[in-house]
Amino acid sequence: GEPFEPKNQRALLPFLRRVRRELPQKTIWSFTGFTWEELHDPAAYPRCEVTDELLSLLDVLVDGRYVDALHDISLRFRGSSNQRIIDVPKTLHPAF
């Protein structure tokens, strides 16, 4: 399913907190059909009260809807060229 549907965000948050606490050396990835901009727009769906914390627990986010016309088998970790691989800590904290 889509991890950034609000009900899924609320369900995933305790799990991600636990992973961060117990396995801090692990790199946490998430894939979403929503864009980074949609996740940060206060008025946009699927933002909810836990979105910011959930994002802060991620290391890498692959964002954007899969577009069949943009499918490219040469891409790593994404299915279509419109999808981006985002380094979350560097994006949230540019001086990081």
Task: Name what the model sees in each region.
Residues T32-G33, G64-Y66:
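Short secondary-structure boundary segments
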